[in-house]
């Protein structure tokens, strides 16, 4: 090792010429360090001295060894390499430190020599294939043991069975991997008597480490258990769960996470191609020289060229956007689908509430609870309302606005409305309750509506002028449906006819009691048979 280091240092020192600028600069530095050196207190006596900078060394003129009329080939003896990793086994091949022979060829001689060597290698390869075919024929594809097949060698294959002259040499690849036995034979033929056996174990460990890439995490990465985090490298995700299986939100690697983004790669590619094509078009349509006067036709052509460049730029942008739209990764699509599914419930709630003419308030209205007791016949709203909120159901016909009061909010001044305050009460008509019968042919049974114990609201019919006036006369007794009717409604109509109050929203279903005491759900729309709704999609709430 010392001899190798010494030879390397000697070569570096030999490269430096004696009369180079490096030696001159050293002499100048040594002379400047002497007692005769000048400083700010002792000005120089001679102004002809101009020291050269050590940073500006002159380039040494070296003889160029590259020649294009001949080929020089250096031949090395084989040694155990310790630098390559074969696909199987050990005994890697290498070269000696110094070459043992040198030979020069012309271009034609080198081409002929290469063809001869390739044909010789091809002849040996065809012999091996012919020998393998004979062994398989004697053993019947390896199913029968044959002593004759075990004794066959390459010398048993004649050259007459192989036609190498009519084979195109350029159609073959000659840098083929060699098996372990062949590598060991080549090393022994080159004079290597002792082959290191420890290299086999090292090569095996390297191959196993190359087969394992990424961490074994699934969706979540624990920094203490993640192999990438322990190694101090980032998690790499080329596609879904490969090579690392962590997700974007669940990766806890302290070094970070890299995800292959095909959209970014495609965008970069399109932008690069666009810039190159625009640059080539600018070079083709260069402006006239400065000494020449620009003619009107030239200016028109230049304007047309700029317009065509702008049009081409817009076309490239459109193609880029189209390509980006079709390059969504699988993980991105799944994430968007999950977001749509999570937001689907809230969207369906908003649409159902809007169809009922309902407004959800964050804070309850200032109405005393004792003035508005609960009703015996609740109204069913098939929507999932958040607990603790207030609901306003505005009237469909508000042709007679009333004067606004001082203490009432602004949204109470537009006309009569129905106010629902969400409270915690047991639901009337729980699933499986006895005594419930089928109300209408167009609606499912009440027990099939899947009504569960959820927050219940109390019905309050209020007016914009006096929200509590309607409830004052009914304190101490249960209000009825006739008490909540406006004055313009006739209460003396027959009970068997459908009742449609003007203050109820058109699509708001309400419940009345028939003569048999069974609850029946009806709607305010006339002459319209509503199909039964799927109870699994919308959960009805009793309010």
Swiss-Prot record:
Domain of life: Eukaryota
Region (Disordered): 1-51, 281-305, 488-543
UniProt-recorded Gene Ontology molecular function terms: DNA-binding transcription activator activity, RNA polymerase II-specific; DNA-binding transcription factor activity; DNA-binding transcription factor activity, RNA polymerase II-specific; phosphatase binding; sequence-specific DNA binding
Low complexity bias (residue ranges): 31-40
Localization in the cell: Nucleus
GO process annotations (BP): apoptotic process; positive regulation of transcription by RNA polymerase II; regulation of transcription by RNA polymerase II
Pfam families noted in UniProt: CSRNP_N
GO annotations of cellular component type: chromatin; nucleus
Ranges of biased composition (kind: Polar residues): 42-51, 296-305
Principal location: nucleus
Modified residues (N-acetylmethionine): 1
Coiled-coil stretches noted in the UniProt entry, renumbered to this chain: none
Signal peptide start and end residues: none
The entry's keywords: Acetylation, Activator, Apoptosis, DNA-binding, Nucleus, Transcription, Transcription regulation
UniProt cross-references to InterPro entries, sorted A to Z: CSRNP_N, Cys/Ser-rich_nuc_prot
Family, as annotated: Belongs to the AXUD1 family.
Annotated function: Binds to the consensus sequence 5'-AGAGTG-3' and has transcriptional activator activity. May play a role in apoptosis.
Identification of the protein by name: Cysteine/serine-rich nuclear protein 2
Lineage: Eukaryota, Metazoa, Chordata, Craniata, Vertebrata
Gene: CSRNP2
